[in-house]
Amino acid sequence: MAELNVKRSKFDRKLDKIKELEESGQLKNQNVNRTLRKFLNNKLALAGAGIFIIILVASILAPLLTSYDPLKADMNSVLQSPSANHFFGTDKVGRDVFSRVLYGGRISIFIGLGSALGCALIGVLLGCYGGYKGGWFDKIVLHISEVFMSFPQLVLVLLLVTILGQSLTNLIVIFILTGWGSVYRMARSQILTIREEEYVQSLKAFGLNEFLICYKHMLPNAIGPIVVNITLSTAMFILQEASLSFLGLGVPLEIATWGNILNAAQDMFTLQNNWWLWLPVGITISLFVMGINFLGDGIRDTTDPTQQG
């Protein structure tokens, strides 16, 4: 009996210690530090983050890195190969390709990241509430998402571009309309798993507002896969913009984007003889997408409980 009391006493002391750590925030800080340490030990994730940051910062600081206007034609400098004056050469109307890659990155990254965040906002709001609440609301939204996801996304995008017309705003709206379903299903799946946890049932028993339970207490525990989805969706939308613009169906040609730069290299003569029109931007797109994928994989490995060491 005395031995049992000693064990209980030790257990109570450990429990009190955990409560003290939680109240002081030390336990949360320890978890954050452990997660950060795991991420910093992932070399591919660090490489991806580095590539992502370098290209993003270079695009943002484009006016400081080049003095050329990406839209201004110069018929005296047509199709010049790379040189000290034009690092990536010039295109068919004399525009500086280096300048167009930097400024085009602004628009392409904005399209990719803006579309991914828009999908996440809609998908998370609907998925979290639907997964928590269930009932008729969940069934209706689930069926709507199934309708959108029953079509190949690129085919649906092409159809909507034809109907709505080509513009920067239309393209982002179309990407969000066709892409929110995957985030919704992911968020819904996470919440369906979490909603049976004891702490959720306790919050319900105390009569806490269901929106607070859903978005304040449950969502943070499901945020890891959602962040990963945002990174991977950003890469996907950038590639889709490049593909559509290459075909002449994306952003209007007068706007510099990575896809519109590739649009100038559609003929075999250009591919063989004017490599600087497509190779630099092609490498930039490949590096950026690869960097985002490495970063997303690193975040997934870091936040996945089954991967915790």
Predicted features and spans:
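Short helix-capping/hinge motifs at transmembrane helix termini and TM-loop junctions
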Residues: 62-69, 131-135, 161-166, 178, ...
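Generic hydrophobic transmembrane alpha-helix motif, especially the helices
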Residues: 87, 91, 121-123, 131-194, ...
